[in-house]
Amino acid sequence: MGVSKKKSGEIRGDLIPGLPEELAIECLVRVPFQFHSSIKSVCRSWKCVISSRSFIKERIGFGKAESLLCLVQPLTSPPSPAMMEGGEMSQKKKEEEEGESQMTQQLLQPRITGTPLYGLSVYNATLDTWHRVAIPERIPLFCECVAIQDAGKVLLIGGWDPETLQPVRDVFVLDFFAGEGSGRRFRRGRPMSAARSFFACASVGSTKVYVAGGHDDQKNALRSAEVYDVEKDEWSMLPPMTEGRDECHGFSMATDPGFCVLSGYGTETQGQFRSDGEIYDPITNSWSTIENVWPFPDLSPRGRTAAAAAEFPGDFRGCRLWCFIDSERQSQPHWEVEDDSMKWKVIMDTIRLPVTTMTSVFAGSLSGQAVAMIGGGGEESGTMMVKTTAEKNGGKWSHVNTPSGFSSLPFSCSSIYV
């Protein structure tokens, strides 16, 4: 088993008296995430096991991990105690009260007229519940949300200052596998070297997050890129991209540690999305170009593309993406493109959304399923829908119960198992 007595001799005696360690682990992995805070206090051995990084792998292996979708979205109303309490987001009572009080004060503080307050919402797809994370300070508008599964962390990066509406360098780290409290801890990370918003962002490997492009405080499209090591809390600069790319979208290149920046537009061509992308190779420390990968000059890839579940053998070097399109838009159902180095490939499959072109949508992926939050004035407005894509016929869209406090269209999202 992955969790054992090997960890510096911290675990002594039986985890559960009278049971072999393997059976004891099988019992512990079945405890819902919301109770991990409580069972960590039972004994040192249990705390050591549940706080270890290998414990989540055991939960995934036994099919007991809970799938969370984290969304950065405008707050439509002050969070009620019901939204802040219970489930996997619960804390000790004192922490709950402090978090609620701080968030309420944030909502009451004066801001620029018309500027929404953003929050981090969490949908537990396993339990079909919604919660909002109590964060001790305001998070930036339009910040990027990215998860690093192996590290058990969700990061909020960049965006706009809610007071000045200027791009920021901020990094916030939410640790779901923290050793104390509810099993999550919130802190500030080291800021980026450059302030940016509307940029490409993706986790690559077990500890790294790459960012590239976006725009600065003068709305200039950026070529710059950098990488964050979440364990070392350090940023390192990368070579700049060939082109400045605002409103671009980022992806990990699946089996290899590459980083793909999809589409975007230049300073002088705002709103005209490029058909190409760029891929960073950490082995050569260089960028290559991939042509004809985004065929929609009038459509941003943000909220319309997501990483699909891997279905390719180990020799596949690149990424497979879902492209979410309106029911009325013309498009190929599938296309494949290689970069100019002939090393990387991007495979794109289209998924038809249950909406028309007049509806606002933010789409992504969650546990191998397509997921879409629907906005605008359509019939399905304010709801989330999921589609099981593994079925031969492509599956059907189905509704997710979405409380009114969580119905606003998100800006970014990421998913993580706990």
Curated annotation (Swiss-Prot):
Gene3D superfamilies, A to Z: 1.20.1280.50, Kelch-type beta propeller
Record-annotated membrane-spanning stretches: none
Kelch repeat residue intervals: 104-150, 153-206, 208-255, 258-314
Disulphide linkage map: none
GO terms under cellular component: cytosol; nucleus
Subcellular location: Nucleus
SMART domains: FBOX, Kelch
Pfam families to which the protein is assigned, alphabetical: F-box (PF00646), Kelch_1 (PF01344)
Keywords noted in UniProt: Kelch repeat, Nucleus, Repeat, Ubl conjugation pathway
Origin superkingdom: Eukaryota
Pathway: Protein modification; protein ubiquitination
Residue ranges occupied by any F-box domain in the UniProt entry: 14-61
CDD domains: F-box_AtAFR-like
Region (Disordered): 79-104
InterPro entries for the chain: F-box-like_dom_sf, F-box_dom, Kelch-typ_b-propeller, Kelch_1, KMD1-4
GO BP terms, alphabetized: negative regulation of cytokinin-activated signaling pathway; protein ubiquitination; regulation of phenylpropanoid metabolic process
PANTHER family, sorted: F-BOX_KELCH-REPEAT PROTEIN SKIP20, OS02G0208700 PROTEIN
Self-association state and partner proteins as the record states: Part of a SCF (ASK-cullin-F-box) protein ligase complex. Interacts with SKP1A/ASK1 and SPK1B/ASK2.
Free-text domain note: The F-box is necessary for the interaction with ASK proteins.
Physiological role: Component of SCF(ASK-cullin-F-box) E3 ubiquitin ligase complexes, which may mediate the ubiquitination and subsequent proteasomal degradation of target proteins.
Name listed for the protein in its UniProt record: F-box/kelch-repeat protein SKIP20
Organism for this UniProt entry: Arabidopsis thaliana
